[in-house]
Curated annotation (Swiss-Prot):
UniProt signal peptide: none
Source taxon at top rank: Bacteria
One GO BP annotation of this record: DNA-templated transcription termination
Organism phylogeny: Bacteria, Pseudomonadati, Pseudomonadota, Alphaproteobacteria, Hyphomicrobiales
Similarity annotation: Belongs to the NusB family.
Pfam families named in the record: NusB (PF01029)
Keyword tags: RNA-binding, Transcription, Transcription antitermination, Transcription regulation
Gene Ontology cellular-component terms listed: cytosol
Annotated gene: nusB
GO molecular function terms listed in the Swiss-Prot or TrEMBL record: RNA binding
Species this protein is from: Agrobacterium fabrum (strain C58 / ATCC 33970)
Transmembrane segment boundaries: none
Protein name: Transcription antitermination protein NusB
Protein backbone atom coordinates (compact mmCIF):
# COMPACT_ATOMS: atom_id res chain seq x y z
CA UNK A 1 0.00 0.00 0.00
CA UNK A 2 1.37 3.37 -0.96
CA UNK A 3 1.43 6.42 1.29
CA UNK A 4 -1.43 7.92 -0.73
CA UNK A 5 -3.59 4.81 -0.26
CA UNK A 6 -2.86 5.04 3.46
CA UNK A 7 -4.34 8.55 3.71
CA UNK A 8 -0.99 10.19 2.96
CA UNK A 9 0.60 8.90 6.17
CA UNK A 10 3.81 6.88 5.84
CA UNK A 11 3.46 3.35 7.12
CA UNK A 12 5.24 2.60 10.37
CA UNK A 13 7.47 -0.46 10.30
CA UNK A 14 6.10 -3.20 12.51
CA UNK A 15 8.15 -4.03 15.56
CA UNK A 16 8.77 -7.73 16.00
CA UNK A 17 7.84 -9.23 19.39
CA UNK A 18 11.51 -10.03 20.11
CA UNK A 19 12.42 -6.38 19.50
CA UNK A 20 9.56 -5.32 21.77
CA UNK A 21 11.06 -7.51 24.48
CA UNK A 22 14.46 -5.92 23.96
CA UNK A 23 12.89 -2.48 24.24
CA UNK A 24 11.09 -3.64 27.39
CA UNK A 25 14.40 -4.81 28.86
CA UNK A 26 16.03 -1.45 28.16
CA UNK A 27 13.07 0.44 29.63
CA UNK A 28 13.11 -1.85 32.69
CA UNK A 29 16.80 -1.10 33.28
CA UNK A 30 16.07 2.63 33.01
CA UNK A 31 13.11 2.33 35.39
CA UNK A 32 15.14 0.30 37.91
CA UNK A 33 17.89 2.92 37.71
CA UNK A 34 15.33 5.67 38.32
CA UNK A 35 13.96 3.79 41.33
CA UNK A 36 17.45 3.16 42.73
CA UNK A 37 18.77 6.70 42.31
CA UNK A 38 15.59 8.72 42.79
CA UNK A 39 13.79 6.58 45.32
CA UNK A 40 10.73 6.29 43.07
CA UNK A 41 8.27 3.51 43.96
CA UNK A 42 7.54 0.58 41.67
CA UNK A 43 3.88 1.44 41.04
CA UNK A 44 4.73 5.06 40.25
CA UNK A 45 7.58 4.26 37.86
CA UNK A 46 5.66 1.52 36.02
CA UNK A 47 2.67 3.83 35.56
CA UNK A 48 4.93 6.65 34.33
CA UNK A 49 6.70 4.45 31.78
CA UNK A 50 3.52 2.85 30.49
CA UNK A 51 1.70 6.18 30.15
CA UNK A 52 4.48 8.48 28.99
CA UNK A 53 7.54 6.59 27.74
CA UNK A 54 7.01 3.19 26.13
CA UNK A 55 6.65 3.91 22.41
CA UNK A 56 6.35 7.67 23.04
CA UNK A 57 8.45 10.71 22.22
CA UNK A 58 9.88 12.46 25.28
CA UNK A 59 12.01 15.61 24.97
CA UNK A 60 12.80 14.80 21.34
CA UNK A 61 13.81 11.19 22.08
CA UNK A 62 11.53 8.48 20.73
CA UNK A 63 11.25 5.45 22.97
CA UNK A 64 10.90 2.15 21.14
CA UNK A 65 7.60 0.35 21.29
CA UNK A 66 8.01 -2.14 24.12
CA UNK A 67 6.08 -5.14 25.37
CA UNK A 68 4.39 -3.60 28.44
CA UNK A 69 3.76 -6.92 30.19
CA UNK A 70 7.43 -7.91 29.76
CA UNK A 71 8.50 -4.52 31.12
CA UNK A 72 6.11 -4.79 34.08
CA UNK A 73 7.22 -8.36 34.81
CA UNK A 74 10.90 -7.41 34.97
CA UNK A 75 10.48 -4.27 37.08
CA UNK A 76 8.00 -5.73 39.56
CA UNK A 77 9.85 -9.06 39.66
CA UNK A 78 13.20 -7.43 40.48
CA UNK A 79 11.58 -5.45 43.29
CA UNK A 80 9.70 -8.50 44.60
CA UNK A 81 12.72 -10.84 44.44
CA UNK A 82 15.52 -8.39 45.27
CA UNK A 83 16.44 -10.26 48.48
CA UNK A 84 17.04 -13.34 46.32
CA UNK A 85 18.64 -11.52 43.37
CA UNK A 86 21.20 -9.35 45.18
CA UNK A 87 22.98 -12.23 46.98
CA UNK A 88 23.30 -14.07 43.63
CA UNK A 89 24.84 -11.00 42.02
CA UNK A 90 27.19 -10.45 44.98
CA UNK A 91 28.36 -14.07 44.87
CA UNK A 92 29.03 -13.82 41.12
CA UNK A 93 31.29 -10.78 41.47
CA UNK A 94 34.96 -11.83 41.50
CA UNK A 95 35.90 -9.60 44.37
CA UNK A 96 33.93 -9.19 47.55
CA UNK A 97 32.31 -5.97 46.36
CA UNK A 98 29.07 -4.74 47.84
CA UNK A 99 26.49 -3.93 45.19
CA UNK A 100 26.54 -0.32 46.37
CA UNK A 101 30.03 0.06 44.85
CA UNK A 102 28.77 -0.79 41.38
CA UNK A 103 27.49 1.95 39.11
CA UNK A 104 23.69 2.25 39.50
CA UNK A 105 23.16 1.43 35.81
CA UNK A 106 25.28 -1.73 36.07
CA UNK A 107 23.35 -2.70 39.20
CA UNK A 108 20.05 -2.28 37.35
CA UNK A 109 21.31 -4.33 34.37
CA UNK A 110 22.55 -7.16 36.59
CA UNK A 111 19.36 -7.25 38.66
CA UNK A 112 17.13 -7.36 35.58
CA UNK A 113 19.26 -10.02 33.88
CA UNK A 114 19.39 -12.13 37.03
CA UNK A 115 15.62 -11.91 37.39
CA UNK A 116 15.14 -13.21 33.85
CA UNK A 117 17.63 -16.05 34.39
CA UNK A 118 15.73 -17.05 37.53
CA UNK A 119 12.18 -16.64 36.28
CA UNK A 120 12.08 -16.81 32.48
CA UNK A 121 13.00 -20.44 31.88
CA UNK A 122 11.31 -20.14 28.46
CA UNK A 123 14.05 -17.74 27.32
CA UNK A 124 17.48 -19.25 26.53
CA UNK A 125 20.36 -18.05 28.71
CA UNK A 126 22.28 -16.93 25.61
CA UNK A 127 19.44 -14.58 24.64
CA UNK A 128 19.18 -13.08 28.13
CA UNK A 129 22.92 -12.55 28.54
CA UNK A 130 23.36 -11.14 25.02
CA UNK A 131 20.46 -8.70 25.44
CA UNK A 132 21.79 -7.32 28.72
CA UNK A 133 25.37 -7.09 27.41
CA UNK A 134 23.99 -5.03 24.50
CA UNK A 135 22.17 -2.78 26.97
CA UNK A 136 25.46 -2.35 28.87
CA UNK A 137 27.17 -1.41 25.58
CA UNK A 138 24.54 1.29 25.03
CA UNK A 139 25.65 2.96 28.28
CA UNK A 140 29.33 2.04 28.60
CA UNK A 141 32.35 1.70 26.30
CA UNK A 142 34.90 -0.06 28.47
CA UNK A 143 34.82 -2.91 30.97
CA UNK A 144 31.19 -2.81 32.09
CA UNK A 145 29.78 -4.94 29.22
CA UNK A 146 32.44 -7.59 29.98
CA UNK A 147 31.49 -7.47 33.66
CA UNK A 148 27.80 -7.90 32.82
CA UNK A 149 28.64 -10.85 30.55
CA UNK A 150 30.80 -12.57 33.17
CA UNK A 151 28.44 -12.03 36.11
CA UNK A 152 25.29 -13.12 34.27
CA UNK A 153 27.15 -16.13 32.84
CA UNK A 154 28.23 -17.21 36.35
CA UNK A 155 24.69 -16.75 37.67
CA UNK A 156 23.27 -18.80 34.78
CA UNK A 157 25.72 -21.63 35.52
CA UNK A 158 24.78 -21.56 39.20
CA UNK A 159 21.01 -21.28 38.70
CA UNK A 160 20.35 -23.20 35.49
CA UNK A 161 23.51 -25.25 35.21
CA UNK A 162 24.21 -23.72 31.83
CA UNK A 163 26.16 -20.81 30.46
CA UNK A 164 25.85 -18.63 27.39
CA UNK A 165 27.02 -20.59 24.38
Amino acid sequence: MSDVENGGEPRQPSVKPANQRGAARLAAVQALYQMDVGGTGVMEVVAEYEAHRLGQEVDGDTYLKADPSWFRSIVSGVVRDQTKIDPLVRSALLEDWPLSRLDATVRAILRAGTFEILERKDVPVAVIVTEYVEIARAFFEHDEPKLVNAVLDRIAKQVRGEAKR
